[in-house]
Structure formats: C-alpha cells, structure tokens
Amino acid sequence: LPYPWTQKALDGAPRELPCILKSRTGCGSKAVHVLTEETYHEGTVYHEDDIFQEWIAGEEEEYTCGLFRSASGEIRTMILRRKLRGGLTGCGTVEENPAIEALLTSLAKVLELRGSINVQLRLRDGVPYVFEINPRFSSTVRFRHQLGFSDVVWSMQDSVGHGIAAYIPPPKGIHFYKIYEDVIDWKRTNI
C-alpha cells in the first residue's frame, strides 16, 4: 500500500519540506496547511493530535473513494476525482482507474472490511498514494448515493442479514457539484 510518510509533530522536525501539517482528528480538509521552508518555524508548539505528512503534489489528481465490503466478501467501489471547496468536496467527476480499483480491493481484503469506509488519495506518476482513511460515512455520501453507490443502505441491509441491493456503477465522466442555497425567512422579522 503506497502511502506518504507520516509522523507526529511532537516527535520533532518534519522529515522534509514541503509537507502537510494537519490534525489526526480533523474534519474535512479544514486546518490543513502546506509547510515550506518559509512557513515552517522550529520551536513552534504543536498539539498532541498534529501530524506532519509528506506533501504529494497535484491537486488535480486527488480522489475520494467509497469502499464497501459485505459480510459475504462482496466488494464495491466508487472513484471520484474531486476539487475541494472550504475543506470539503465541492465538485468532481466519476472516474475509472485500474490502479486505484486494485488498491481499494486489496485494502478491503487486508483490513477484512465489513461495511463502508472513505479512502482519500492522490496519484503520483500513476501510482495511488493513500493519505487518509476515514472509517465512517464521509461528506460525499450523498453524492455517492445519488450516483447509485448506496453504501449507507447496503451497510444497514448487511448488518441485519438481508441481501444487499444491486449496484450498477455509473458511467465514467459524470460530473457532480455541491450547491449551497440562500434562504430568506420572511416570516421572522424580529432579530
């Protein structure tokens, strides 16, 4: 499993710069910083959960992947190339990538996964590098569900011993967008 070097920030200076500074317990990609020679300062006080991680260049090659494995061992995947907005996936495209697919399948087997996880990675020279695994339903769960990857439903069906509903992967190239709405409450006039 290719992955970027990662170390606790409290263990000393990062192995190399540039690198990423983030919390192990973050939410989305909020409070993620790229440290460079100019922005890294020795003696900075870090928190217990802060980590340094190898920076993998190429925001245009960032993916978020849904990975589901049933109790019977059936593996289902969805690969989404994404662009971040405000620390969360703002838009993206359904992709097919044999190297990523092989990595996800291997990961599901090695972890003896039952249920769903979210795997985030970047490609470097065509090789997928996993930089984060979220053992939960991620912020892309609604996108995935609308595209037919119903891992929440499958997880519930599987946990009570029902057969899981069929999955027809969406075609490569479908685009998705997160849209925020402005709402005006004309009934509430006293603030």
Where in this protein do the model-derived segments appear?
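A short, flexible beta-alpha/helix-coil linker loop
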Residues: 26-27, 84-88, 136-139
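A generic fold-level signal
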Residues: 13-15, 27, 47, 60, ...
